[in-house]
């Protein structure tokens, strides 16, 4: 009938190419899950007592901090920027929050978390102001503030160390708090917080106008500006949110380790970038998901904690592994992602075979 749409068989007959159901982002996430599964199988053969509840709990607790930082980094990278100061922000917020809690033992947990996130947000706003309104490349700005924030912490600490004995008991027990226990596997509160934060932000990116603006600015800043989008405010907000999430990660870092020195958070900037990029976030901006960043964080912490348990591999290879993962992820994004996106945006091919004419009969 003339008023009905062509069915699948008719579309194939007309030469229309059927589109796959999986978007490139979903395909990358499924590939990451496969790599994680293979990694677990390989290390289970190399390491005794590898598949244990205690190791699972250790990986997920460590992953929670990396995942929150990866989410922070992802939001900035989506706007075609990068924040290399997140490790220093973690160090500053962890130390200052610990210092405050040591002097004010009765501080409620919500207020302590808010203090850490507020400090991080202020530091992120400083980064964002210089990038968005000062027009200074983000890699230059955050390399500078990485050193500035760390130097301030060293000067402020004056060789003092925050110890677990000086902190409130609720904070020391926070990483061990369990939401659900399944045999020897504990779903701890710190992991739950990280997952809730990431899922909430992913929903905001996918369903709110703010999320569409973030992707638009990262995809083509000039076009977004011509369309009337407040590109400076969007960039500033991305850095502020990155700082606030880094502050949350600083609080989690403080609760996990208890003992905080001026070296707290060093190296986390590399881990956050690696988790985001390995998770499928394009380093060129405008593409990627927080779910992918979460899986990237899981893979990175799994590899790091697994490699430590293999005696033949030196622990100093950790950064080399992260660097290799970043290079492989970027190469894969350019090689595979480009072809997949071209496939999605290219017009369907028409069949070269001419359509058959219906037979006609003379009256």
Residue ranges and their predicted role:
Residues 1-41, 226-233, 303-363:
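Cytosolic-side transmembrane-helix boundaries in multi-pass membrane proteins
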Residues 21-24, 77-82, 103-104, 121-164, ...:
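Short loop segments and helix-boundary regions at transmembrane helix junctions
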Residues 35-51, 153-157, 201-209:
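Structural signal for alpha-helical transmembrane segments and their membrane-water exit/capping regions
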Residues 63-73, 88, 92, 125, ...:
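Hydrophobic alpha-helical segments embedded in the membrane of multi-pass proteins
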Residues 108-116, 122-127, 131, 182-261:
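Helix-loop-helix "hairpin" substructures at the membrane interface of multi-pass membrane proteins
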Residues 240, 246, 256-323:
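Transmembrane alpha-helical segments in multi-pass inner-membrane proteins
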């Amino acid at each position: 009938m003339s008023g009905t749409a062509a069915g699948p068989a008719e579309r194939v007959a007309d030469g229309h190419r059927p589109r796959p159901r999986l978007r490139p982002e979903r395909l990358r996430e499924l590939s990451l899950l496969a790599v994680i599964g293979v990694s677990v199988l390989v290390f289970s053969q190399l390491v005794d007592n590898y598949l244990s509840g205690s190791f699972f709990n250790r990986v997920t607790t460590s992953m929670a901090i990396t995942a929150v930082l990866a989410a922070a980094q992802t939001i900035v990278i989506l706007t075609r920027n990068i924040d290399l100061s997140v490790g220093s922000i973690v160090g500053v917020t962890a130390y200052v929050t610990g210092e405050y809690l040591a002097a004010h033992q009765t501080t409620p947990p919500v207020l302590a978390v808010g203090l850490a996130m507020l400090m991080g947000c202020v530091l992120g706003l400083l980064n964002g102001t210089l990038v968005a309104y000062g027009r200074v490349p983000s890699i230059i700005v955050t390399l500078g503030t990485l050193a500035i924030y760390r130097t301030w912490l060293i000067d402020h600490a004056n060789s003092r160390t925050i110890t677990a004995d000086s902190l409130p008991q609720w904070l020391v027990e926070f990483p061990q708090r369990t939401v659900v226990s399944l045999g020897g596997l504990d779903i701890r509160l710190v992991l739950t917080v990280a997952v809730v934060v990431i899922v909430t932000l992913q929903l905001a990116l996918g369903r709110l106008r703010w999320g569409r603006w973030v992707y638009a600015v990262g995809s083509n800043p000039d076009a977004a500006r011509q369309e009337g989008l407040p590109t400076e405010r969007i960039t500033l907000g991305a850095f502020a949110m990155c700082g606030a999430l880094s502050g949350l990660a600083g609080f989690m870092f403080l609760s996990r380790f208890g003992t905080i020195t001026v070296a707290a958070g060093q190296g986390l900037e590399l881990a956050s970038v690696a988790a985001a990029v390995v998770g499928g976030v394009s380093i060129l901006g405008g593409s990627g998901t927080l779910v992918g960043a979460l899986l990237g964080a899981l893979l990175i912490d799994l590899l790091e904690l697994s490699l430590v348990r293999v005696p033949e591999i030196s622990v100093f290879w950790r950064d080399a592994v992260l660097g290799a993962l970043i290079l492989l992820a970027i190469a894969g994004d350019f090689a595979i992602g480009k072809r997949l996106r071209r496939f999605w945006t290219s017009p369907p091919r028409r069949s070269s075979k001419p359509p058959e004419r219906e037979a006609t009969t003379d009256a």
